[in-house]
């Protein structure tokens, strides 16, 4: 999609590209490695592209929602042959994720942030959605990694190990 519109945006010397990332674009999520990897990749792609196209008046932003009340848990695929050795931790994480999604914000909140990114006079590169994601973003940057790790494991109900 991006490649299809970039030529026109360059010609008109303006445009906005908004990608939907996730808090797991900058925070790990156990047992969700492939999803996390795709969101980490989107973060890198969006930031790199922003630097490449800014000279043409084009801005690239990434929206970073946290837990949002969608059907993502029901629509996610579980490995075809999950290893039993990971079953206990995987089940705890999936339960924690499902409960957090149920308590999460609505997709409307994310849509409002997308609208802000599209219409802002001074678009930002990143738009964390909600106070929890903003807090986690700051914590990830400034807290000691051991403290962040303990909090993450607690959030996902994993043993402190």
Q: Which residues are covered by each model-predicted region?
A:
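Residue(s) in the substrate-gating loop at a strand-loop-helix junction
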Residues: 22
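SDR active-site lid
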Residues: 55-124
